[in-house]
Amino acid sequence: MRKLSKIFLLALFVTVAMAQTPEPPLSDTRLTIHTLVREDIFAGFLSNDTGRLSRGEKNVQLLLEKRPAAKAELLAWQAGTSMYRAVSAYEDNRNDDFQKYYKQALDQFAQARQNDKSGGGVDAVTGGVYAVFGDRLPKEYRAAAWAQAYDSFQTLWKLQGPAVDKLPVHLRGELLGGLAMSAMRTGRTEEAGKYVDKILALLGNTPYESVAKKWKDNPKTIENTSIACLTCHESGRLNARLTALNSAK
């Protein structure tokens, strides 16, 4: 009876949480696929909200039908959810499930790169996923994960670096933070230090600055601390974006 009560309470909690986060309007073409799925998927990544993660996965699948031009980016998001499930399985000592989901994630990332025609979107998702989960993979997989993260952030830097000071704080912080973390974890210590200096110069009075100061004081700490996802993955961004679009009519 107690077990059934716990299951009921969990189901009730998930139902209430989902009710507080309205279904993303997939038919609204003013919104990018990233805006439509990011909030639900990161609720899974950062808070283990499996209900919202599942909704994000479902919406990715629906968007593959509705927006075929965004196939590459959507496949990258699918890879991200598979990587989350792989890491969760590893941390629960379910090795068979880990191997299944990890291989699935790698295959989906490969498909995303094969279908990528525009550049940027796939690398943003790829770099972000590995920045969140790279250190949580089994040790033997971490070097490859961070090598891929480094390549993805380098591609983003070529695209966004010239105007990095004009990016929103979240994008600026995640880009520079990802560059610093991936450089350090792939043995590029001097390069990592340059990105830390850029964070200090361009992200004053933000959560990124406080982490970068610690890194500056002791560069070795970059090896085992994270700066990923410090801002703007909270609920409400989708609604805020919709409100802004509707107000601009």
Language-model segments: which ranges?
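Bacterial N-terminal signal peptides
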Residues: 6-16
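Boundary at the C-terminal end of the N-terminal hydrophobic targeting segment
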Residues: 17-21
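Flexible helix-coil transition and linker loops at the boundaries of alpha-helical arrays
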Residues: 25-27, 61-76, 109-122, 157-169, ...
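Conserved alpha-helical positions within TPR/SEL1-like repeat arrays
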Residues: 76, 83, 124-128, 177-178
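Sequence context of c-type cytochrome heme-c attachment sites
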Residues: 180-181, 185, 200-221
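Short cysteine/histidine-rich metal-coordination sites, predominantly Zn2+-binding motifs
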Residues: 222, 242-249
